[in-house]
C-alpha cells in the first residue's frame, strides 16, 4: 500500500426564472367604470443565478507500522450569486388592451437586485494509534458579504479526542459483558450570521408625495459594527455497550458560551426616524447540561418477534450574562391584574424567559 492523495472538485449551478403576466378585465370588476383598479394588467419577472464551487484534497500516508493511521483533508468552497425581480402594474387600460406597456394609470412599480458571496476554507486532521487513542483537530475560516468590511471573517477551530478504554489489555476480563467503554472530550467554536444582505450600507427607495413629486427615502440604518455570533462549546462524552451492544448508552456533559448573540428587529427610539434595527449583537448567554441516550438491540426477543427500546434523558440550564438594555425594555412585560398574567422577564444573571409570580 502506498501513500494516497485524492482530489475531488465539483461545480453546481442553480438557475431560476419566473415570469407572470396577469390581466383583470373591466367585466370582472364591481367597481365604478372610472375606478383606478379596473382593466388592470400586471407583469412580474424574477431571475436568479448561483454557483457553488467546491475543491477537496485528501491525503492518507502509509505507515510501515500499522498501529498508526493518519488522514488530513483540506477543502475550499465558494458560493456566489445574483437575483433580480421587477414588477409593473398598470390600470385604466382600454378594453382589449392587456399589455402594461400600453400606458394608463401606474399604481405600482418596483424592482430589486441582490448579489451575495460567501466562502470558506477548512482543514482537518485525524490520527489514531491502534484505534485506541484517537485525536482530531480542525479549523474553518468563513467569509461572507452579509457583514461589512472588517467584520466578514470568522475563524472556528475545534479539537477532540477519544480513548477506547475497553481495548486496553487490562480490560480483557470485562469483555464478556462490557463491549464498549470510551471517553470523548472535545472543544470547538461555531458561528451564526444574519439571513439578510446589505445591512452594512444605507438603502433607499422611491417615495411618492414629496411636495407633490417622487423622491428618495432611506429604508434602514446601516450596521457597521454587526459581527459574527460566536459559540464556544466544551463537551465530555462517554460511550457504553453491554453484552455485544445489546444495551448501549451515551452520556454527554456540556457547557456552551454564546457571545454577541444576534437578534432581529431590536427596537430603538423613533427619534432616529426608524423603529428598529434589522439585526443587532445584543448579549451573551451560558448553557450547561447533560444528556443520556439509552438504546437496546433485540433485548426482548421471542421467535421472530423482538422489541427495541430507546430512552432519552436531558437537562439544560441557561443564564443571561449580558443583554442590551433596549432588548430588556422590549421583552420584559408588566403584571396585568385583570387577567392574572404572570410577569415574564429577561434579566441578567437569570435564565432566559424566567416567569415571576410577583
Show which residues each predicted segment covers:
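Extracellular/periplasmic, surface-exposed regions of secreted and cell-surface proteins
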Residues: 1-24, 35-350, 355
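N-terminal, polar/charged subdomain of small-to-medium soluble alpha/beta proteins
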Residues: 30-31
Amino acid at each position: 500500500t502506498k501513500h494516497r492523495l485524492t482530489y475531488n472538485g465539483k461545480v453546481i449551478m442553480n438557475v431560476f426564472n419566473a415570469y407572470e403576466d396577469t390581466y383583470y378585465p373591466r367585466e370582472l370588476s364591481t367597481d365604478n367604470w372610472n375606478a383606478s383598479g379596473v382593466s388592470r394588467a400586471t407583469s412580474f419577472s424574477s431571475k436568479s443565478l448561483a454557483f457553488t464551487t467546491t475543491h477537496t484534497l485528501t491525503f492518507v500516508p502509509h505507515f510501515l507500522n500499522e498501529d498508526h493511521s493518519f488522514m488530513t483533508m483540506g477543502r475550499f468552497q465558494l458560493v456566489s450569486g445574483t437575483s433580480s425581480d421587477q414588477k409593473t402594474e398598470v390600470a385604466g387600460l382600454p378594453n382589449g388592451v392587456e399589455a402594461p406597456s400600453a400606458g394608463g394609470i401606474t399604481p405600482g412599480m418596483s424592482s430589486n437586485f441582490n448579489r451575495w458571496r460567501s466562502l470558506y476554507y477548512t482543514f482537518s486532521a485525524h490520527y489514531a494509534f491502534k484505534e485506541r487513542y484517537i485525536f482530531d483537530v480542525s479549523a474553518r475560516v468563513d467569509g461572507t458579504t452579509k457583514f461589512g468590511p472588517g467584520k466578514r471573517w470568522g475563524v472556528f477551530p475545534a479539537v477532540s479526542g477519544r480513548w477506547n478504554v475497553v481495548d486496553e489489555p487490562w480490560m480483557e476480563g470485562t469483555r464478556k459483558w462490557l463491549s464498549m467503554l470510551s471517553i470523548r472530550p472535545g472543544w470547538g467554536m461555531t458561528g451564526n450570521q444574519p439571513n439578510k444582505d446589505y445591512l452594512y450600507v444605507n438603502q433607499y427607495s422611491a417615495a411618492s408625495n414629496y411636495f407633490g413629486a417622487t423622491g428618495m427615502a432611506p429604508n434602514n440604518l446601516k450596521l457597521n459594527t454587526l459581527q459574527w455570533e460566536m459559540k464556544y462549546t466544551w463537551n465530555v462524552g462517554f460511550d457504553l455497550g453491554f453484552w455485544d451492544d445489546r444495551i448501549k448508552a451515551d452520556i454527554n456533559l456540556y457547557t456552551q458560551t454564546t457571545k454577541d448573540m444576534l437578534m432581529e428587529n431590536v427596537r430603538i427610539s423613533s427619534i432616529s426616524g426608524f423603529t428598529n434595527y434589522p439585526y443587532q449583537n445584543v448579549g451573551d448567554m451560558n448553557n450547561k447540561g447533560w444528556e443520556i441516550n439509552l438504546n437496546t438491540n433485540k433485548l426482548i426477543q421471542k421467535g421472530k418477534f423482538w422489541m427495541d427500546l430507546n430512552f432519552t434523558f436531558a437537562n439544560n440550564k441557561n443564564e443571561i450574562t449580558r443583554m442590551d438594555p433596549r432588548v430588556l425594555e422590549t421583552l420584559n412585560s408588566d403584571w396585568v391584574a385583570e387577567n392574572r398574567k404572570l410577569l415574564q422577564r429577561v434579566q441578567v444573571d437569570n435564565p432566559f424567559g424566567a416567569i415571576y409570580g410577583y
